Amino acid sequence: MVTYGINGIGRIGKFALKALIEREAKVSWINDSSGTIDLHRHLLEYDSVHGKWDADFSNDEKSITINDKKIIFQTSSTIENIELEDVDIIIDCTGYYKSRSKLLNYFNMGVKKVVVSAPIEDENIANIVYGVNQDIYDSKKYDIVTAASCTTNCLAPIVKVIHENIGIKHGSI
């Protein structure tokens, strides 16, 4: 089974974690550089927009448990200072590591793939908008992929439909 880790438990990281837990994926590690473990457990359980996550939560000094799944929790502000073991895929939701060079330390710790929640301009990194260009993904070619940007994810599907059905000569955002 693939093991996931999430760096950055803000809005996007929190919902990535929730999606993985609800699909019974194995999440072994989360990190957020600000706040205490008690605060993050509370923020995972209660969301100001989406309400309470219907799950059982507890924590100790080093981990958060969600529905009997224990997840190591760290508060490191840099990749160089994290302690990472047995994680296959990292989902980086920090908004900070937006270049290949900044993400390389994950691979030095044994991570096989990195998914970044922010766009990265690099021809060796795939910026994917599901429903628009997910067919460009090649697991042998890309070890880092991004989910593009919020603006791109909102605009690209609409632009694709308009362009394919009516045509677009040029535009700007």
Language-model-detected regions and their locations in the chain:
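N-terminal Rossmann-like NAD(P) cofactor-binding subdomain of oxidoreductases
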Residues: M1-S172
